[in-house]
UniProtKB/Swiss-Prot annotation:
Listed Pfam families: eIF3h_C, JAB
Keywords attached to this entry: Cytoplasm, Initiation factor, Protein biosynthesis
GO cellular component: eukaryotic 43S preinitiation complex; eukaryotic 48S preinitiation complex; eukaryotic translation initiation factor 3 complex
Keyword Protein biosynthesis assigned: yes
Subunit structure of this chain's protein: Component of the eukaryotic translation initiation factor 3 (eIF-3) complex. The eIF-3 complex interacts with pix. Interacts with mxt.
Recorded family membership: Belongs to the eIF-3 subunit H family.
Name of the protein described by the UniProt record: Eukaryotic translation initiation factor 3 subunit H
Main function: Component of the eukaryotic translation initiation factor 3 (eIF-3) complex, which is involved in protein synthesis of a specialized repertoire of mRNAs and, together with other initiation factors, stimulates binding of mRNA and methionyl-tRNAi to the 40S ribosome. The eIF-3 complex specifically targets and initiates translation of a subset of mRNAs involved in cell proliferation.
A Gene Ontology biological process term: positive regulation of Notch signaling pathway
Length: 338
């Protein structure tokens, strides 16, 4: 284990620490899935730490453990994490902190809290990633496990602490360029693969009765409700920004009018041989307006885009099932009439 740690430290110093893909052990995936589904029953957000090491620009996640619930005020989270990693080290388990994971809310993981947490992780542990598990989509039979890292532009913007429209334009940052998705693969040991093959033979054959189930009741409703809420939030942000622009325009108009008046007065003073008044005296009367924070609006736009993509994907699948069901029903009715 010490050799692994030394190898990892040397690689961290010599390379640029970029991650090409994430390799996750099946045991770590099962732990994450179990924790996220347990917390989803209580409508809580599940979060935990990822342990592993970096090998040739591949981030290997070999273990994980959950964070304590935020409601427990007596629990010191930092001390808890250090204690767990120390005990894992004693039993010769990979204990290097390489990131964190969390469950997803209605298929949308982008949030201000996620951005802040990943920024602190990535600035302290450069190769760290955040793994997001979508409980709702996975419960319908589609394993949804994605890994993300902040882009260099997003990290630079957070370091500067400048979230004005000018900063977004200068760094060319939008909701689509806040995070970069890293490919993730799941790897099992040969013994696990053999066991899975044997278990697959013991399972009864699925007749596929639920393949044409539309299932539009809750999924589409939740996505539409979340989409409407995000659109309302974006509208409020747009109203605030429009008010800011109106105030800035009004202030600029008054400043130009005052400067023009001062220029005329200075011309009269010059003709009379009197000293002129500097323009700084007028400019000091108009303090520059503080530009609003556009980070919230950018994140909300990303959430709207994600919800729209999920709704479009879900509707396209449901429409395909609907047409197939209609054809089968017509064929069944035609057969019965004969």
């Amino acid at each position: 284990m010490a050799n692994r740690a030394n190898r990892h430290a040397a690689r961290t110093e010599d390379s640029d620490n970029t991650i090409n893909y994430v390799q996750c052990d099946g045991l770590a995936v099962m732990k994450m899935v179990k924790h996220c589904h347990e917390e989803s029953s209580n409508m809580d957000l599940a979060q935990g730490a990822l342990l592993g090491l970096v090998v040739d620009k591949c981030l290997e996640i070999t273990n994980c453990f959950p964070f304590p619930k935020s409601g427990d005020e007596t629990m010191d989270e930092e001390l808890y994490q250090l204690t767990v990693m120390r005990r894992l080290r004693r039993v010769n388990v990979d204990h290097l902190h390489v990131g964190w994971y969390q469950s997803s809310d209605v298929g949308n993981s982008l949030s201000l809290a996620l951005l802040e947490s990943q920024y602190h992780y990535q600035t302290s542990i450069e190769e760290s990633v955040v793994v997001v598990y979508d409980t709702q989509k996975s419960s319908r039979g589609f394993l949804c496990l994605k890994a993300y890292r902040l882009t260099p532009q997003a990290i630079q913007m957070y370091k500067d602490g400048d979230f004005t429209p000018e900063a977004f334009r200068t760094l060319k940052v939008g909701y689509e360029s806040l995070f970069a998705e890293i490919p993730i693969v799941i790897k099992n040991s040969p013994l696990t693969n053999i066991m899975m093959s044997e278990l697959n033979e013991l399972l009864p054959e699925d007749k596929g009765h639920n393949f044409l189930d539309l299932g539009t009741a809750t999924v589409l409703e939740n996505q539409m409700r979340s989409l409407i809420e995000r659109v309302d939030e974006l509208y409020q942000e747009a109203v605030r920004y429009n008010k800011y622009q109106q105030v800035v325009f009004k202030q600029d108009t008054e400043k130009h009018r005052a400067l023009a008046k001062l220029a005329a007065e200075n011309a009269v003073r010059t003709s009379k041989g009197e000293p002129t008044v500097p323009e700084e005296e007028v400019i000091k009367q108009f303090r520059p307006m503080t530009a609003p924070n556009r980070l919230t609006a950018t994140i909300t736009s990303g959430q709207i885009n994600t919800h729209a993509q999920h709704i479009a994907q879900f509707c396209s699948q449901s429409l395909a099932k609907l047409f197939i069901t209609e054809s089968l029903q017509n064929a069944k009715e035609a057969k019965e009439t004969k």
